[in-house]
């Protein structure tokens, strides 16, 4: 019986480029992601080298999005020269493992601007009425 990828026994070529990225699992309208290390050129449905975390993007009853990270193994693979996909880099930046990704700043700026516009639009409607 073979071991699961979470145990870190995946086969790979030593000189090939590695990437830490999300692999989508779950059902329709209910995504769930594994954060995995795999060879860069492989399809996400190919066998992975190692699973280093998981991410549930839909909020639970307490409005929490659950993330589990094996920071020791992530640091190991980054030390070995593994690349990061943009969503994985954003998540690791929010988690405090890396500097915050610039796209995270842009998303926060857009959200603040949209909230300010939504707040200002009822005031304009009241003043014109």
Swiss-Prot record:
Q: Give the GO cellular component terms, alphabetically.
A: mitochondrial small ribosomal subunit
| Localisation per UniProt entry | Mitochondrion
Q: What is the lineage of its organism?
A: Eukaryota, Metazoa, Ecdysozoa, Arthropoda, Hexapoda
| Source domain of life | Eukaryota
Please list the GO terms describing molecular function: structural constituent of ribosome
The subunit structure is: Component of the mitochondrial ribosome small subunit (28S) which comprises a 12S rRNA and about 30 distinct proteins.
Q: Which organism is it from?
A: Drosophila melanogaster (Fruit fly)
Which keywords accompany this UniProt record? Answer: Mitochondrion, Ribonucleoprotein, Ribosomal protein
Gene field: mRpS16
* NCBIfam families, per the entry: S16 (TIGR00002)
Q: Which GO terms describe its biological process?
A: mitochondrial translation
Q: What is this protein called?
A: Small ribosomal subunit protein bS16m
Query: What family classification does the UniProt entry report for this protein?
Result: Belongs to the bacterial ribosomal protein bS16 family.
The family database entries (Pfam families) matched by this protein are listed as: Ribosomal_S16
